[in-house]
Regions:
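N-terminal signal-anchor module of multipass membrane proteins
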Residues: 1-63, 70
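C-terminal transmembrane helix-loop-helix hairpin of multi-pass membrane proteins
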Residues: 3, 7, 185-274
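C-terminal ends of transmembrane helices
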Residues: 16-19, 63-76, 118-132, 174-189, ...
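Central hydrophobic cores of alpha-helical transmembrane segments in multi-pass inner-membrane proteins
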Residues: 39-40, 58-68, 88-93, 114-120
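Alpha-helical membrane-inserting segments
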Residues: 43-46, 91, 95, 99, ...
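Structural signature of hydrophobic alpha-helical transmembrane segments
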Residues: 45-61, 101-117, 154-173, 214-227
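Cytoplasmic-side transmembrane-helix entry/capping segments in multi-pass membrane proteins
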Residues: 76-87, 107-111, 131-142, 187-199, ...
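Internal active-site segments that recognize and position negatively charged phosphoryl groups
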Residues: 127-209
Length: 274
């Protein structure tokens, strides 16, 4: 069918080359772990400064993810996907900043819709059937979801207890990233999820109790964010793009931002958004 065959194209050649690389997501490059810890540290500092600085840091991380996410997942049109993700990151940041104080989620759904519409406009075929259309849409929209999830924690950054609650979740992510290194041992491998959960729970309890929260809150939040973030790296790290530096950085950033919606949900249940 016309427009479907992409043999010999630079993108096809790149996929064939990457396809020969064996990827084991239990033994991700050290760059990923280091980038996770740096991302956690940046967000932990920003959330203490308030919702404005926090939104700015997430926007910068969104730009970094815009560059590496299409490389990680081998988007059929990486340049177009990067542009859409950059536009989406800017829209999400603007939506959070223009919303009334304490209501930074008011325009977030609209900004997500803007990003999704941009993804459709960029991917919809123009006269021919574009190969891997669904792949391209899925890759772009998961990137949008990652940035939106990170931005969703911005309402919690507007109060001292809310920012402390985010800190508990981020501490769980960091603890899980360190415990994940046990997966490099052949006898551990995929079983690293258990030390990840334990580390997230222990560190979560410690940070929660020092921040004025209950042990059960620290246990649940730390364990959930650690295991969620670890699962993101296990799933999205099992692709050939994880062998590229851009893909590794995007994987790290995405695995820290994606649990954000979970932190928001638990924070809402704890009455921190009232």
């Amino acid at each position: 069918m016309a427009g479907v065959n992409e043999q010999g194209s630079p993108q096809a050649t790149r996929r064939e080359a990457l396809g020969r690389v064996s990827v084991d997501s239990t033994r991700l490059p050290w760059v990923v772990t280091a980038a996770v810890l740096v991302t956690v540290a940046a967000l932990a500092v920003a959330v203490r400064w308030g919702d404005g600085p926090y939104v700015a840091v997430v926007a910068v991380l969104g730009l970094l993810l815009s560059w590496g996410w299409p490389l990680l997942l081998d988007a059929p049109n990486p340049v177009g996907a990067s542009v859409v993700l950059m536009v989406s990151s800017a829209a999400l940041a603007t939506a959070a900043l223009v919303s009334p104080a304490g209501e930074s989620l008011r325009w977030l759904p609209f900004a997500v819709c803007v990003g999704m519409m941009a993804a459709f406009l960029q991917q919809v075929p123009r006269g021919t059937i574009r190969p891997r259309l669904v792949d391209g849409l899925a890759i772009t929209m998961t990137g949008i979801a990652a940035v939106a999830s990170g931005m969703a924690m911005s309402p919690l950054a507007g109060s001292a207890r809310g920012s402390a609650f985010v800190g508990v979740g981020l501490a769980g992510v960091a603890a899980g990233a360190v415990a994940e290194l046990l997966g490099r041992l052949r006898r551990v491998g995929a079983l690293a999820v258990f030390p990840v959960m334990i580390a997230g729970a222990v560190v979560g309890i410690w940070v929660a109790t020092t921040s004025g929260f209950t042990m059960s809150a620290g246990l649940g939040l730390g364990m959930l964010t650690a295991s969620f973030s670890y699962s993101v790296r296990r799933i999205f790290g099992a692709v050939s793009g994880a062998g590229e530096v851009g893909g590794q950085l995007a994987l790290a950033v995405g695995s820290v931002l994606l649990p954000g919606v979970l932190v928001l949900a638990l924070g809402s249940l704890a009455g921190l958004l009232a």
